[in-house]
Amino acid sequence: MNPWPLLMRTVSQGGNKGRLSVFLFHRVLSEPDPLVNWDPDAVTFNELMGWVKLCFNVLPLDQAVRRLSERSLPPRAASITFDDGYADNFQIARPILESHGLTATFFIATGYLNGGTMWNDRVIEAIRHCRTSNLDLSSIGLGIHDLSTVASVRHSISEILRSIKHLQPSQRDKSVSNILAITETNPRSDLMMTSDQVIAMRQAGMQIGAHTVNHPILANLESKAACDEVADSKCFLEDLLKERIGLFAYPNGKPDLDYRMSDVETIRELGFDAAVTTAWGVADDTTDPMQIPRFTPWDRTRFRFGARLFQMHLRSKAHHSGQKASR
């Protein structure tokens, strides 16, 4: 007998004591990729969804947020989300979700639909296809990188991404262009969804949310530019789907580092119902609906998956209890 459904019910009881777990994914790969081992392949994702269905009552995110505020969540409530808008979300993740009778919300960075490539993927693919085992990026301030083993390539990718992630958008784009020039590689054009796939995703019963146009770090932008990024992505999706878009995901998503409280207020003023972050945690009735935490389940055994979620609920419960006691 699997103990986790019963154990999760003790920390996520529903009703007045309702709590919401929101899972975060980006890609689901057709097969394992040693260079991006943080993304599950189809077999792993299928197994994860089996565990999620066993342990949780999965709700569409908009319904879950509404029921959280109404204090009418079922026990063990959860929602599933994907960020960015990768084509494999439609091609691989969607059929697996449907096979389990599950729904998810897909947050789309609209500027990369129809053949675009996000900056981080341009870097990953440039390093993947680099024809030398020693990559010298010192001329652009990014050092010299050993590419002789899978482990060293993975380390180099992480270091380069970390070095340029929080640059101003124009500086970041220039760095990426320089990397492509030095490695003599071209970006892929098949990584992201098409507009037709987004429409088909919605018609299949999945939810669609906004994720800005160009996936900038909002905290790096002036207020108007940040507002335009959010508003333009919302308008694009509303025009495409002929319906209101009420959900948003902050790019990168770390409070204070990647977005500011002024950005939270912008999201509220633009008429969104809820927004999700990448801060780890569990939402309860004290959570700001414009800053709902999420969790990436990386564990590869059912026991560890359940144990980590149970522990996260306990920590979050203790944190919120302390907050209430201090009021």
Positions of PLM-derived features:
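A short alpha/beta connector and helix-capping loop motif
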Residues: 92-110
